[in-house]
């Protein structure tokens, strides 16, 4: 199928892969379960076809520990350490070159480029560009491609099912569609174990993560009649609780799960002088447009951004955008209340 944002089909990409020998595969910076699952599924599949394949990480940052069960994860190479030439660079779950970070240099050296993604994007970075925003996950697309290549297998199935389960919130988010259930069934038939994914990823929270949750809940700020909730974490929170950044990944979904909330936002200092923002929507509200206002992006119901000023500034500017965009009828009064509240927290935020 040729989607509106594509210039090719998965069938054509399969034929192109069959005609080439050396590949590099990379996903976006701060890779999540879908990004890693899709990339590793493709890596295992192409290697089963006799191809020479290297899986890359966009930066040297460690990946989420809870994904350590994924086969082949330990062999991923930080892109800055990879200096060889490859014929084909496959970008998976990446809407633009900026999100490749260090891997952009490998992308530029490659002779040919393929993009496989489910993020809507206004730009294209590949000669073969397949983008399907209707797909629940990049792993759904990777699995479809592997079927076309006749390159499915147990490892591929586990990686793909991990991506599908994590990006759909165990089949509970708005992006769920009939196809992801079909693919899930196929991966289980191929040897994937849903209980393994559930145990290792969804049922293995650390004590530091729970302590961060306590802090986040104590700082919740509700606006627009409880339809918008915002909270934050500071660098010192991670230090004092002995937590790593991955320990905070689940927290945005806890905010989203509060009764009456339509939009949730958490802002976290990332240890690099930046603020990482995560946005979630529980209805048809489009939070991706808010993320794009700050140079980020994502999906309609789940998006992220990086903010380059102080946490105090972020706690005014980003929630203001949310209120004005999603709740215009309440904007003037609620933005004024927000500004008063954040001014009262200045000393704590600057500490």
Q: How would you name each of these model-derived features?
A:
Residues 2-29, 37-65, 83-88, 169-351:
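Hydrophobic helix-and-loop "lid/oligomerization" segment in the mid-to-C-terminal part
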Residues 4, 74-79, 130-134:
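Short acidic-hydrophobic, aromatic-tinged amphipathic segments that line or gate anion-handling sites
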Residues 70-72, 109, 125-126, 294:
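Short, structured coil segments at secondary-structure junctions
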Residues 62-63, 68-78:
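Glycine-rich oxoanion-binding loops at beta->alpha junctions
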Residues 38, 68, 102-105, 127-128, ...:
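Short amphipathic alpha-helical segments
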Residues 116-183:
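Short alpha-helices
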Residues 78-128:
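Active-site cofactor/cluster-binding pocket
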Residues 30-31, 94-97, 119-121, 235-236, ...:
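Short glycine-rich anion-binding loops that position phosphate/pyrophosphate groups of nucleotides
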């Amino acid at each position: 199928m040729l989607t509106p944002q594509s210039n090719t089909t998965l069938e054509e990409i399969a034929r192109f892969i069959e005609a080439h020998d050396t590949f590099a595969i990379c996903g976006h910076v701060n890779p999540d379960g879908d990004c890693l699952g899709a990339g590793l599924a493709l890596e295992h599949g192409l290697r089963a076809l006799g191809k020479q394949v290297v899986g890359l990480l966009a930066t040297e940052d460690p990946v989420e520990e809870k994904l350590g069960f994924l086969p082949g994860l330990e062999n991923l190479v930080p892109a800055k350490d990879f200096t060889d030439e490859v014929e084909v660079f496959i970008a998976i779950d990446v809407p633009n070159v900026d999100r490749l970070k260090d891997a952009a240099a490998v992308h530029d050296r490659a002779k040919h480029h393929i993009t496989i993604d489910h993020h809507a994007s206004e730009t294209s970075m590949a000669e073969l560009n397949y983008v399907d925003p209707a797909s629940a996950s990049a792993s759904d697309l990777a699995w479809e491609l592997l079927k076309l290549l006749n390159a499915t297998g147990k490892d591929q199935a586990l990686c793909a099912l991990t991506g599908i389960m994590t990006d759909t919130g165990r089949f509970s988010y708005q992006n769920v569609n009939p196809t992801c259930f079909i693919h899930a069934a196929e991966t289980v038939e191929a040897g994937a174990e849903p209980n393994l994914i559930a145990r290792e990823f969804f049922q293995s929270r650390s004590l530091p993560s729970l302590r961060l949750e306590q802090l986040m809940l104590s700082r919740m700020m509700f606006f627009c009649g409880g339809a918008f909730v915002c909270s934050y974490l500071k660098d010192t929170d991670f230090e004092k609780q002995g937590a790593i950044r991955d320990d905070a990944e689940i927290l945005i979904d806890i905010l989203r799960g509060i009764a009456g909330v339509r939009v949730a936002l958490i802002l976290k200092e990332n240890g690099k002088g930046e603020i990482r923002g995560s946005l979630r929507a529980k209805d048809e509200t489009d939070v991706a447009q808010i993320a794009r206002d700050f140079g980020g992006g994502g999906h309609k119901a789940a998006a992220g951004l990086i903010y380059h000023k102080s946490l105090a500034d972020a706690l005014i500017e980003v929630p203001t955008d949310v209120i004005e965009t999603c709740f215009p009828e309440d904007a003037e009064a609620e933005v004024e209340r927000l500004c008063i509240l954040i001014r009262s927290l200045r000393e704590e935020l600057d500490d």
